[in-house]
């Protein structure tokens, strides 16, 4: 597998530190509000990266954090006159509602920053001892000029960065690009004891600490949105490599933005849509489909029309899978002469899928290979009085490939099928009795439920509209 490494700006063969194992970290949300569509893209993309690596046989240890102490959380808590932890716990719960709805698997570990204050203090103390950080009036700053490789991820020399930076009023740092790893306590804000007095950690040091505590000195893959390249990931590298004296991460993977009318979606611009709001109208799966429908480094434009296109595409997948279930109920045990050739032919779609995913996680081409499989199934299996072996072969390949992408996960077959089949049976009886008005009424009722009927020689088939 090759992945695009932001650090080197080229596609590179993925070679793990330990054969057969992958250690990866993704920056999680700052939990002060509902996540928006832009926040959800890295969730879905790197969920698929983890799924695919496991599909290819790797043992993946995946850490994704919660930033549960931050200026925005404190501000929200003050507005609502509650403790900061009430805000963070509330939105962690809401995060899981959305993540589960999007079929995002929980990471191996989902640590909170506030659970790792001891590790943060240990790293800061070591940075001060080594001369990479300094204390100033209760704050502690990282000295960027002491790290000769500062700017290597964003490919910006330190002198260029300094030219556009300035020290804000009230800051006591030495140089404009120095950043806080510990912030002195302010009245009314949460604080922890430290060698430099009461205070709280800076954002960047939190991720370095959780990386180190749960994954060790060096990890295979660090991932996140392109907006985190600078300063967050740049600062993580500086802190971590100065602390350990070792490379921080071998591969850096960053997903592209979600745009609205070709402008980046963000809370600060007010042009964002929460996952919850969109899901309440369209469901979660169309959102997941949208977020993985383009190669992950490419921008995606969000619009109602595009969401509706995603719904139509998903309906094709659901219709195919539901049709296979119908065929399986009626399939004969005896195999037909050409079955093995058709089943063996399904293997080429797996090969196309793997080829796409091995090329820097190209989900767009991977999805295309699934739709080629669907065309093959619709041509050679559905409605062809297939054998049980042929249908099972088609189902196995369909479920294998869609499963890697986490798609077609809302098949409510048990309750929905029993309801639908009861109505279909009533309609069939009405037709036998030539009660056409009742048969039409039931058909219309099913259509209102989003179910379309199709009369075939094998019986009545249905699919979602």
PLM regions and their residue ranges:
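Short phosphate-binding/catalytic loops that engage adenosine nucleotides
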Residues: 58, 132, 451
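Alpha-helical recognition segments enriched in aromatics with Gly/Pro capping
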Residues: 1-32, 47, 97, 118-325
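The substrate-binding groove and active-site-proximal loops of carbohydrate-active enzymes
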Residues: 78-84, 108-114, 225
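Structural preference for alpha-helix termini/caps and helix-kink/transition segments
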Residues: 264, 271-465
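Short, glycine/charge-rich beta-strand/loop segments that flank catalytic centers
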Residues: 66-70, 92-95, 105-120, 138-147
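N-terminal, positively charged nucleic-acid-binding surface of large information/translation enzymes
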Residues: 8-13, 17-105, 458-462
